[in-house]
Each structure stands twice: as structure tokens, then as C-alpha cells.
A protein has these predicted regions:
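Conserved short histidine dyad/triad with adjacent acidic residue
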Residues: 10, 19-39, 65-75
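Ligand-binding loop in jelly-roll beta-barrel domains
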Residues: 75-103
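Mid-chain, well-packed structural core segment of small domains
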Residues: 51-83
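Helix-adjacent hinge/juxtasegments
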Residues: 4-9, 70-73, 87-92
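Ordered hydrophobic segments in well-structured contexts
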Residues: 26-27, 45, 88-92
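Short, conserved beta-strand element in jelly-roll/cupin
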Residues: 38-53
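Transition segment at domain starts
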Residues: 1-20
């Protein structure tokens, strides 16, 4: 089963799925600055574009990631992503599904 998530008035959208390799979301973000909570450990892999990441959110420092790069988000933390042009990402994560799937 595939779940759908929408954030920030549709500016960020993702699909989530689970298979024998684990739990995943794959999504797209329009330009803007978006803050997310990560209740469980996850990895944000940039598939297309570039973004600046502030980890944890509000910490002051920004790191730029480009297509093909990833960063790790510890569970129980938050992060902010600053996007200047539409990006696509893959997010493997630990634990149970966080969105709309009932599996």
C-alpha cells in the first residue's frame, strides 16, 4: 500500500511505502523554507536539485547538499530545509510508518 502526505499547503508532497528493505518516503519540495520533525532516525537523500539544511532547526548554521548527497537526521530532532528551486528526495527511515498507512 502507498500512503500520501502533503505539507505546507501542498508545497511539499511525498509518497510512503514499505518493502523488505525498509520504510521509505519519496517526495518533492517547491521553493521555500520548510521545517520538519523526525520522531525516528531518517536519511534525506537528494535525488534532484540542491538545498541548504539547518540541523537542528533554528541552530543558525546551514549546510548545502547537492544532487546525490544525503544527511542523517537523528530521531527526536527537527531540521529546516531551504529550497530555491524544486527538489526531489528519497527518505529511508527507521521504525513504523509515520503517515497515513495502516499496515
Amino acid at each position: 500500500m502507498i500512503g500520501q502526505n502533503e505539507y505546507y499547503g501542498g508545497q511539499v508532497r511525498s509518497l510512503e511505502f514499505k518493502n523488505e528493505q525498509g520504510n521509505f518516503t519519496v517526495g518533492v519540495m517547491e521553493s521555500g523554507e520548510w521545517t520538519f520533525e523526525a520522531p525516528v532516525k531518517e536519511w534525506m537523500r537528494l535525488v534532484h536539485g540542491s538545498w541548504d539544511v539547518q540541523q537542528p532547526a533554528g541552530s543558525g548554521g546551514w549546510t548545502t547538499y547537492r544532487e546525490g548527497e544525503q544527511f542523517e537526521v537523528p530521531g527526536g530532532t527537527d531540521f529546516t530545509v531551504r529550497v530555491t528551486d524544486t527538489v526531489a528526495y528519497l527518505c529511508p527511515y527507521t521504525g513504523e510508518f509515520l503517515g497515513h498507512l495502516d499496515m
